[in-house]
Amino acid sequence: MLKLFLSTPRTLPNSRFLLLRRLQPLGLRYRSDASSLHLFTPTWRDHATNTIIKFVPQQVAYVVERMGRFSRILTPGVAFLAPIIDKIAYIHSLKERALEIPTQSAITLDNVSLGLDGVLYIQVYDPYKASYGVEDADYAISQLAQTTMRSEIGRLTLDHVLRERQSLNIHITDAINKAAESWGIRCLRHEIRDIRPPESVVMAMHQQVSAERQKRAEILESEGKRQAAINVAEGDKQAEILDSEGQKIKTINSALAEAQAIREKASATASGIAVLADSIKKQEHGLEAVSLYIAQQYITNFGKLAKASNSMIVPASTSDVSGMVAQALSIFKQVSKTTAPDKSTPKELHTDEK
């Protein structure tokens, strides 16, 4: 005949009290602290009573000993235990758990003392190793995380610790997994929660940040001035280029216009001379009229030059005006003789050809 193990509820809510009343007729013992206890803890030799029929919750493993030796592991569902000789020695939660790592001090590679704390996420994957491989798993994992964190911090400088927190977490997780493999515990991830450097270092970091911001502001200001100067220089350059292009075009157009005017003037002068020469040839006394015109122009222009105080004519005799006129007429006659066509030349050439 089975012995009923009844427990009197003390601080249970009404729902738990009703559940207790339902379990008592089955001869099962209900523990009020079963759902709130840290099931993944050291030894649980007095927290699971052999009630012959046992309902194992989901994601919970019961380690059963028979006569003091390991017998088996109960998986979720219903299980039957032999009275007296079977005993639930350990209870482990197979869920992921968060284990808080207390604050500790660590010294970086550049001799800066830091205050660190973190959170470690762990999970039992082998209840047998978790039961018999370590005495106090929580304490062992916490101490291992602290020593690993100090070791990893000692390899890095302060700047690397602040900048590479994610890689530091990965290194700590790998180191804990290697050490805790024989405990049946897996470290899923580690998170550094807070890094507290000394006050002097914090003040120096603030000054460095302020200096960096001031430096960036000055650099941006100088870059703005530089860009503005470049833009002004580029504008002046383009203006000079456009102005020179305009002056070039203006000079070319002016030269072309002047050349065209000279050509037109020369053409008009040549036409006038040709008409005048033709008229002189046709007139009976044309050469005498031209000689008279030259003499008049010579005397008139010489008189204008004589009035100018800053003009000098060398050689020239102002007392012998008639001689100068005669000289000018002599030159004209020689030029007219040289330019006059020789009508006998073609005949002589024709005779020579014969």
Curated annotation (Swiss-Prot):
Query: Is Kinase one of the keywords?
Result: no
A GO biological process of this protein is: mitochondrion organization
Compartments where located: Mitochondrion
Where does the protein principally reside? Answer: mitochondrion
Q: Which InterPro entries match?
A: Band7/mec-2_domain, Band_7, Band_7/SPFH_dom_sf, STML2-like_C, Stomatin_HflK_fam
**Its domain of life?**
Eukaryota
List the record's Gene Ontology CC terms alphabetically.
mitochondrial inner membrane; mitochondrion
Which family is annotated? Answer: Belongs to the band 7/mec-2 family.
Task: State the protein's name.
Answer: Uncharacterized protein C16G5.07c
Organism annotation: Schizosaccharomyces pombe (strain 972 / ATCC 24843) (Fission yeast)
